[in-house]
């Protein structure tokens, strides 16, 4: 890359900057300098992509089965739980809004711990008075008895009686009986614990919401991905799936 191609470039200012960087890397002839320059370049590319605007082409009509299909396809690629959390948050938000159950559904970024955000779980659903009435813990892996007990210990202090565990991969086989006993124990103590997966919950909720509610849901997923700055690959994937409907 040399300045002899400068006349062919539309953005001559950035071309000159690129030439200067590459010239310095070549002149220094140091692998460490080259590595640092590459890392900085990739970091900047990632930063710009992260801020890129993605258009979500909401379909005019969408059936229950099509909604579930794109949800499944969206979760096929691993995301450390980010995609699952976006779907779950969108579902509870739309259900809460449409049925006037919740004034607001609070959540944080996937990388933030509940302790650091002050939330009891991944999602907090607030009633019209601003009180937390439902909490939702979203698990992209199997739910264990240790995780259940640890989370319930935190929730008991806040006196919330309705608790959902959305366990995408179900319950750990070795813990099924113990988890069942723990759920019964929590009920006696005044807590209703519901262990489900997103698709069992989604099939019922999205049926009750009807077609207008399903359109709201797929739109809300895009808003969740944007609002919590999900990776560009996740946002583009959702946009592509909507375009396939």
Each model region followed by its residue ranges:
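Short, charged/polar micro-motifs that form catalytic or ligand-binding hotspots
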Residues: 4, 8-11, 57, 74-82, ...
């Amino acid at each position: 890359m040399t300045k002899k191609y400068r006349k062919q470039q539309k953005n001559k200012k950035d071309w000159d900057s690129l030439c200067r960087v590459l010239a310095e890397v070549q002149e220094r002839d140091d692998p460490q300098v080259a590595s640092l320059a590459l890392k900085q370049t990739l970091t900047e590319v990632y930063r710009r992509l992260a801020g890129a605007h993605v258009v979500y082409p909401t379909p005019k009509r969408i059936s229950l089965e099509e909604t579930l299909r794109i949800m499944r396809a969206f979760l096929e690629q691993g995301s450390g739980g980010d995609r699952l959390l976006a779907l779950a948050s969108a579902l509870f938000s739309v259900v809460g809004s449409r049925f006037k159950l919740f004034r607001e559904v609070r959540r944080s970024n996937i990388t933030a711990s509940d302790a650091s955000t002050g939330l009891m779980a991944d999602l907090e659903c607030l009633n019209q008075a601003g009180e937390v009435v439902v909490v939702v813990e979203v698990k992209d892996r199997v739910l264990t008895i240790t995780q259940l007990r640890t989370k319930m210990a935190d929730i008991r202090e806040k006196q919330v009686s309705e608790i959902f565990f959305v366990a995408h991969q179900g319950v750990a086989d070795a813990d099924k009986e113990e988890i069942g006993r723990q759920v019964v124990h929590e009920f006696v103590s005044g807590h209703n614990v519901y262990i489900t997966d997103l698709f069992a919950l989604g099939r019922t909720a999205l049926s009750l919401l009807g077609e207008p509610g399903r359109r709201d849901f797929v739109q809300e997923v895009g808003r969740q991905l944007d609002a919590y700055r999900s990776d560009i690959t996740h946002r583009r994937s959702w946009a592509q799936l909507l375009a396939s409907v």
